[in-house]
Regions:
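Folded extracytoplasmic luminal domains of secretory or organellar precursors
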Residues: 2-201
Length: 201
């Protein structure tokens, strides 16, 4: 239990940082974007995400990783979810990314509540938050109103996403191009430890 408390002191700044990335968030986002058009959307997302995490706690990490990979290429626009040759999803940079079926199930649940209203980009953002809360991580306010991309580029995923074989200077440069400094890079890079390590102990 103590390790969770310790991790919260690291996670809260990391998530605030992730959410404050100006390059991925348009100015017109609001917390009440779906209040009139789909008032049950957030409850539906939460229910689906919590069920997925209850069935397999690893799903929390998968959802956060999906959101990170989506936001790091073209911004938080759900371009990672687009399929086809030459798409981000098909890029070698996203070979190890899992959890698409969880997002598909969440999207299906939202569509049953209000068809064609809630963007996949917003579903990814809210699902990452709800998954974090489901494993006793911090919560934060998610501003809504993102639009889904109609384009996806595998080459951009290769050039934009940090890779495991990058040295320190390359990683710092990679994050710097996204407006992040070395300290912020460490916070975001270490974020997955919170999700993955407790599953092994």
């Amino acid at each position: 239990m103590g390790s969770y408390k310790y991790m919260e002191t690291i996670l809260i700044p990391a998530f605030i940082l992730l959410l404050s990335l100006n390059y991925v968030m348009p100015c017109n986002l609001t917390v009440n974007f779906y209040d009139k058009t789909c008032p049950k959307a957030l409850a539906s997302i939460k229910r689906s995400v919590w069920a997925a995490v209850a069935s397999n706690p690893r799903n929390a990490a998968l959802l956060v990783r999906l959101h990170f990979h989506d936001c790091f290429v073209q911004g938080c626009d759900a371009s990672l979810l687009l399929e086809g040759a030459g798409s981000e999803k098909a890029s070698p940079a996203n070979d190890g990314v899992l959890g698409y079926e969880v997002i598909d199930a969440v999207k299906a649940a939202v569509e049953r509540v209000c068809r064609g209203v809630v963007s996949c980009a917003d579903i990814l953002a809210v699902a990452a938050r709800d998954a974090t809360v489901a494993v006793r991580g911090p919560s934060w306010t998610v501003r809504l109103g993102r639009r889904d991309s109609t384009t996806s580029n595998a080459a951009e995923a290769v050039t934009d996403l940090p890779r495991g074989n990058m040295n320190l200077n390359q990683l710092i440069d990679n994050f710097r191009r996204k407006g992040l400094n070395a300290r912020e890079m460490v916070a975001l890079s270490g974020l997955m430890c919170f999700f993955v390590l407790p599953l092994y102990y």
